[in-house]
Amino acid sequence: MSPQTETKASVGFKAGVKDYKLTYYTPEYQTLDTDILAAFRVTPQPGVPPEEAGAAVAAESSTGTWTTVWTDGLTSLDRYKGRCYHIDPVPGEENQYICYVAYPLDLFEEGSVTNMFTSIVGNVFGFKALRALRLEDLRIPVAYIKTFQGPPHGIQVERDKLNKYGRPLLGCTIKPKLGLSAKNYGRAVYECLRGGLDFTKDDENVNSQPFMRWRDRFLFCAEALYKAQAETGEIKGHYLNATAGTCEEMIKRAVFARELGVPIVMHDYLTGGFTANTSLAHYCRDNGLLLHIHRAMHAVIDRQKNHGMHFRVLAKALRLSGGDHIHAGTVVGKLEGERDITLGFVDLLRDDYTEIDANRGIYFTQSWVSTPGVLPVASGGIHVWHMPALTEIFGDDSVLQFGGGTLGHPWGNAPGAVANRVALEACVQARNEGRDLAREGNTIIREASKWSPELAAACEVWKEIKFEFPAVDTLDKDKKKG
């Protein structure tokens, strides 16, 4: 009898409740290349041993339930069950453990992030035996990755479409995010693109409200885009937010964007949902549209260090589901993002292969084989003084987005865009000449401002602006050792 059809019916059924660890804690297990591996930060309730807690996570996120059931005998649990195969205490934390769980690939539907998350981060997060639970990382096997399309186009194809190489791309979120009429919104888009930006962007909550319906916005933004392209000779884009209340409406908006001939649309992938996002990504590849992804709602899931899901997992899920850009924090701006951890998931988005690296919070070696990379987007509270640090931290394959840092310029939108473009070009040139952006950044910006009155005005406005709050999401360190 094959392992796939072997059952335990002949063993006999014994009703009752037994410890999870008797079945689901298997420290001797050797993981397979086809297993999905998960690293959970587990905080058990007092009196619950870590082995029982880890086994409970493995059980409740795979084949287990709270009591023995006679139908267990109708299948092969050894083939299908999740296994907690290793447990490490968290340095510097009492009663916290990293529990490693292996899931057989047959537990998951091909090409479905929705199904993968329903299993791995489903009911188990409300389990009473656990005080808190956080999914820190996943290892997605190549066999499963190949069932996904992934990003519609990827980094190289985007650069070829835009004909822009050797520098980060520049963007701007139109502000105020809500309340503008479609015509005034389009005017702001035109001024920013004419001033030197590559992209402008709908904010995440701009959908189709009474003050600005989506079709009107799309039309005025397309007009602005084409006018700016004609004046500058550069290819321009505006992230038209196709997020909607239904998948059908979302696709209708993407179809209209394609008919207008614009290069890129946008989706809020967490609030919109992974099923909708994957559908839109497939449409974008088939129709030549780039796809910008906003991560609205991510901090509800990933902000707390002991419960929820780390953003590196959400980033991996996005690369599977599909997106050409995704917001990834700034390190230096107003939003949460510690440098080493941020660079860890930035590499997961862009690179074909990443190694285990405890210093950057990466728990598993990950190969993406032929899956295209995703451009990380730095956005939130950044301005011209941040440009050297952003260029040094994120490198060329990134999008740097200045919303208030463009539209807040004292001379207007177009001068704000000019200031950012001059600052970026100065930083890229200085880097290419071998200068140290981390040490000489302020000097480089001051030198460039002598030749650009727009940049000089921006430097003066934002010279005192800082966001100096400690990051919540930091690496684990032994507090006793300091």
UniProtKB/Swiss-Prot annotation:
The record marks K334 as: Transition state stabilizer. The disulfide bond which can form in the large chain dimeric partners within the hexadecamer appears to be associated with oxidative stress and protein turnover. The modification N6,N6,N6-trimethyllysine is found at K14. Mg(2+) binds at K201, D203, E204. GO terms for biological process: photorespiration; reductive pentose-phosphate cycle. It is found in: Plastid, Chloroplast. Its main location: plastid. It catalyses: 2 (2R)-3-phosphoglycerate + 2 H(+) = D-ribulose 1,5-bisphosphate + CO2 + H2O; D-ribulose 1,5-bisphosphate + O2 = 2-phosphoglycolate + (2R)-3-phosphoglycerate + 2 H(+). Residues 1-2 form a propeptide. RuBisCO catalyzes two reactions: the carboxylation of D-ribulose 1,5-bisphosphate, the primary event in carbon dioxide fixation, as well as the oxidative fragmentation of the pentose substrate in the photorespiration process. Both reactions occur simultaneously and in competition at the same active site. This is Ribulose bisphosphate carboxylase large chain.
